[in-house]
Amino acid sequence: RQVLALFGAGHVAQALVPILAQLPLSVRWIDNRESLTPTEPLPANVDYLCDDEPVGEIPLLPAGSWVVIMTHDHQLDFELAEKALKHPDLPYVGMIGSQTKAKRFVHRLQSKGISDGQLSRFVTPIGLSDIPGKLPVEVAVSVSAQIIRRLHGVNATEAPLTADTTKEALHDTQ
C-alpha cells in the first residue's frame, strides 16, 4: 500500500481521513495536539500519532511516501514542507492553503536553498482547482480527488474533464 503521511488533525483532516481510509493507502495521521486525538476506533489502515515534534516524523517515513500538510500553524507547515522537500525519497508533498500562502512559501523555501527540482514535488494549494468550496468536506473531496488521480497515475496538474472532452471521448468510443 502507498504510505500517505497526513500532518494535521483539524476540520479538513477529520473530513479527509474517512475518505482516505477507503483507498488503497496506509495513512499515518500526525498532529501535535493531544486534544485532537481521535476517540473513536480508526480503520485498520489509519494510524494516529500525537507527537510534540511532528517534523521529526519526516525522516522516519518510508521511501516513496506521500506527504500531505494541513496543520493549524503556518510555521509548522513551513518546517514540514522544508524538511519533506529536503528528503529526496518523498515524491509528493502537498500543502493546504491559499494561492497567497503558496507563493509566500515557495519564495521562503527558495531563500532556504530549496531547488526548482525539489519544488517540483511541492503541490500547493493541494486539491483540484475545479472543485469549489471552502467547507471542510468540500476541501477534503478536492484533496482526495487529487490523491486518487495520483494513485491511478494521472498527473494531478492535467486538465480536468470538461463537457467538450467528455463528448470527444464518447464519440471516440462509438
Label for each model-derived stretch:
Residues A21, P59, L85-K86, Q110:
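Alpha-helix boundary recognition
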Residues I96-Q174:
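Adenosine-phosphate binding glycine-rich loop
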Residues R1-A63, M70, L76-L80:
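Hydrophobic, well-ordered beta-alpha structural blocks that scaffold small-molecule cofactor pockets
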Residues I30, W66, M70-H74, K83-L109:
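ADP-ribose/adenylate-binding Rossmann-like module
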Residues I30-N32, E53-G56, D73-Q75, Y92-M95, ...:
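Glycine-rich loops and low-complexity Gly/Arg-rich segments
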Residues Q2-L4, P88-P91, R121, K134:
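N-terminal hydrophobic or amphipathic segments with adjacent small-residue motifs
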